C-alpha cells in the first residue's frame, strides 16, 4: 500500500509500491515530492484497480477517442473546407493543440493516480471545480449519447430482413407511391417517419416511440454490463469494440474500390483547393475538430491514465493515440467517399435513364436534361454530416450493393462498437470521480447501476417524436463551450498556477526524461492561445447568429432550419452554465472557506493571548 509522510522541510513524500498482480509493470518503489504551498490537502492515493496489460489501456483510450465524429463529421469538414488542403491546418492544429493537451491530461492522471476531481484538488484546492466541471459534462453527454447507440441497435435489428425496410417507399392512395416518400427519398423518409416518427417542431413533444424506448433500455443494460466491474473486466470487451471498426472499415474499403464511381468520390474528396486556406474560418474549424476529436476536457483521459503504473511512458502513448485517431479520421473519409462516389454514380445514371433519350417526355415543361440531372460533380457535392450521413446517405449507398442486408449488419455493428467504446470512456469519467471522492458512498457496481438508471430515465426525453430535436440541442451545447472553458483552465492551472517547472519535474520523475522545448512552448503559450481564440470565436458565433436547429418538413419531404423558441434558449443557457459555473463556484467557495478559516485562526490566537495575559500574575512592585 502507498505510504504518505510529511517531512519537516514541507514536502509531501509518496512512497509507492506496485506489484505484478496490481499492474502491468514490475514492482517499483519511488518518491514523488510536491511543495505544500500549493497543495493544502494531503494527496490521498489509495490502492486502485489497474489495467491487466498495456494493450487494454491503449485499446480503451483509442476506443474513447475514436467515435462517431471521426466517421460523420471529419469527412463533411474536409468536403466543406478545401478537400485535401484541409489536412494542412488539421495536422498543424494536432501538433500545436491536440497532442500537447492529450499528453498533459495523461501525465497528471498517471502522476497523481486519481480521477479528475481528485487530481485538480491536489494540483490546487481552488482548481477543484475543473474536475467537477468535467464530471458534469460527461454526465450530460451520457444522457443523450447512448440514444445514438440505441438508434444503431434499431437499425441493426431491422437489417436482419430482406429486403431492407427502407429499400422501398410505401404505397399511397390508389396504390401510388407515398408522396412524402417520393419527395424525401426512401432512406430519409424511413429515418424521419418510421424510425423517429418526427414531429415538425421541438414544441410538439409528441408521444413515446416505444421501439426506441426498448432499444435505449438495451443500450444501457449492455453498457452497465460493460462498465460495472471496472477496467479489468471492461478491458476484455475492448478487444472487440476497439478493433471491430477497423476490420469493418477495411472490408468496406476493399469492396468499395471495386465499384463504379468510387475513385471519383475519393478524388472529389481529396482534390485540394488551396485558396480555401486563406480563410480564417477553415483554420478555426480544423482546430475545433482536433480539439473535440482527441477527447480532451472530459476528464476521461485523466481517469484512464490513473490506472497506469507510475513510470509508464505516457508521452509516447499520447503521440501514438492522437496519430491513430487522426489516421482513423482520414481512412474513414476515404471509405465514406468511395462508397458515396458509388452512390453518386448510381443516382446520376438513374436520372439519365429516367429522363434521357426516349424518356425526355418525362421532363417537366421547359426543363432540360442538364438542368434536371446536372452532372456527376453535383451528385458528389451533396453534403451530409451527423446522423444524416449514416442513417440516410450511407444506407442509400448500401441499398445499391449486392447482399445489402449483410452490408447493413456490418455497418451498424461497426457503429455500435464505436459508440460503446466512447460511452465506456465518458461514463468512466463520471464513475471514477464519484467513486474515488466517495461523493455517493456505494459499491462500484451499485454506483454504476444508479448512474445508468438516472441517465436512462432522462434519456426517455429523446425517445419522444420530438426527441431528435432535443438530442440536437444537447449535442450542440453540452460539450462545446464547456470543454473549451475546461481545457483553458487546465492549461493555465498546470503551466501557470501549479508551475511549469514543477510539472516538468513530475514528468522527469515518471519518464526519466525532461520535456523538451516543444512541450514547454505549447503548454504555456501556444495551446492556451488557440483554445482562447476558439472559445471567443464560438461565443461570438453563438451571440451574433440566430440559434437554429433542423426539423422535418413532411410537406416538402426535407429538413429545414428554424430558430429555437425563447424557452429553449433558457435550457441552452442551463446546459452551458451547469458545467462552466463549477469552476468559479468552487474557487469562491474555497476562497470563502479560506477567509473564514483565517478569521477563526486569528480569533483563536487573540483569545489565547488574552487568556494567557489574564492568567499571568501581576508583577510585584519591588520599590
Locate predicted features.
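Transmembrane helix-boundary motif of multi-pass solute transporters/channels
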Residues: 53-92, 103, 227-233, 300-313, ...
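Hydrophobic, membrane-embedded alpha-helices of multi-pass small-molecule transporters
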Residues: 59-69, 141, 146, 184-196, ...
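Flexible loop linkers connecting adjacent transmembrane helices
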Residues: 35-39, 73-87, 103-132, 155-172, ...
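Membrane-interface "cap" regions at the ends of multi-pass membrane proteins
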Residues: 2-72, 101-106, 129, 175-210, ...
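Membrane-embedded translocation segments of transport machinery
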Residues: 2, 10, 18-51, 235-460, ...
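A generic transmembrane alpha-helix motif of multi-pass inner-membrane proteins
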Residues: 460-462, 472-495, 515-603, 621-623
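Extracellular/lumenal N-termini and interhelical loops of multi-pass eukaryotic membrane proteins
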Residues: 146-204, 262-276, 343-395, 487, ...
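Transmembrane-helix bundle segments that line or gate the permeation/cavity pathway
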Residues: 67, 94-212
